[in-house]
């Protein structure tokens, strides 16, 4: 009986929740400086969304859905809208740091909160790696185009594997290339974040302006190459075909509007980042919903506009997987 009681006590601790009123009381203590406005929260969400996603997924998306990739982005944005409503309501209801971890703690218990918290840590950590590598590759391409080559030790990473990837003995770290530029980039961003919320928010606003400006430049410049005839075969692969009719493709390549919507959904990840700073915004009940929904709305409009211009300026069968936006503007010799 005593052992059963100990087990039940342990299980009770795992599923124990915290009172929402207690969490609200913590937010009123103002442990962190409340310095962010709705505009700052929207900027944080946009900064997290518009990263490597649109630049790396749209080429593959066009290959899988053709011009109908526009519908895939709309469908992914529509699906994200319901998740955004949940984040907006919960963030306004429990305006303290932690985002999904805090919401899980208040409703599902400690164990679920622990799982969600570490999932978020892994999500933000792992997703930062390809973005940092993309930045490193972009730096290398810019320097190469300017006639300034990087030394061998500073070039992008190259992991050498001999054999099966799941066997630790297959990895040849001695002959692998480490991405120094990506590592330095991550360290600089981490240092910037440690300066304080106001400083990091200001820097994020600058980066967001640069990202949006780059997309707007593409939209305006690409519009000069627009040809409506490129949209005649608008839905070449249907809504959910696994492979094109009568064709053979790689098993890992999704085809159709709905599968591609699931693929490009990666571009929308990040709008929830605004809720992680709930304890640092001036008026969370007002600012969090505006920030989350504003970030998602702006991101959706930019993604769809970019897809329309890309497909209007380039026949969809000619759109490459790598650097499709640069390829689309190549006739302008910018």
Report residues per predicted region.
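Transmembrane helix-loop junctions and nearby membrane-interface residues
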Residues: 81, 131, 138-145, 194-197, ...
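Helix-loop-helix junctions that connect adjacent transmembrane segments
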Residues: 16, 26-32, 69-70, 74, ...
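Extracellular loop-to-transmembrane helix junctions
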Residues: 56-169, 174, 298, 302
């Amino acid at each position: 009986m005593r052992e059963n009681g100990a087990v039940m006590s342990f299980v009770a601790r795992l599923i124990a929740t915290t009172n929402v009123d207690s969490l609200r009381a913590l937010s009123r203590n103002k442990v962190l400086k409340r310095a962010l406005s709705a505009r700052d929260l929207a900027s944080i969400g946009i900064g997290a969304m518009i990263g490597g996603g649109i630049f790396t997924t749209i080429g593959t998306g066009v290959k899988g859905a053709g011009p109908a990739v526009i519908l895939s982005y709309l469908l992914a944005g529509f699906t994200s809208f319901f998740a955004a409503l949940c984040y907006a309501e919960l963030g306004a209801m429990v305006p303290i740091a932690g985002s999904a971890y805090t919401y899980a703690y208040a409703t599902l218990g400690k164990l679920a909160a622990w799982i969600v918290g570490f999932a978020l840590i892994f999500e933000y950590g792992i997703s930062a790696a390809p973005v940092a590598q993309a930045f490193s590759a972009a730096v290398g391409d810019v320097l190469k185009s300017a006639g300034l080559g990087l030394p061998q030790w500073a070039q992008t990473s190259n992991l050498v594997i001999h054999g099966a990837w799941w066997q630790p003995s297959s990895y040849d770290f001695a002959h692998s290339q480490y991405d120094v530029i990506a590592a330095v980039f991550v360290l600089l961003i981490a240092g910037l974040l440690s300066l304080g919320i106001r400083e990091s928010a200001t820097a994020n606003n600058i980066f967001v302006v640069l990202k949006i400006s780059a997309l707007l430049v593409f939209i305006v410049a690409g519009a000069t190459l627009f040809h409506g005839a490129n949209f005649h075969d608008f839905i070449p692969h249907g809504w959910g075909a696994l492979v094109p009719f009568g064709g053979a493709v790689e098993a890992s390549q999704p085809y159709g509007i709905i599968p591609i919507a699931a693929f490009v959904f990666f571009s929308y990840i990040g709008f929830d980042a605004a809720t992680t700073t709930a304890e640092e915004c001036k008026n969370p009940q007002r600012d969090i919903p505006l920030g989350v929904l504003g970030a998602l709305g702006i991101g959706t409009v930019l993604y769809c506009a970019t897809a329309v211009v890309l497909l209007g300026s380039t026949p969809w069968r000619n759109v490459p997987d790598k650097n499709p936006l640069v390829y689309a503007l190549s006739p302008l010799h910018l």
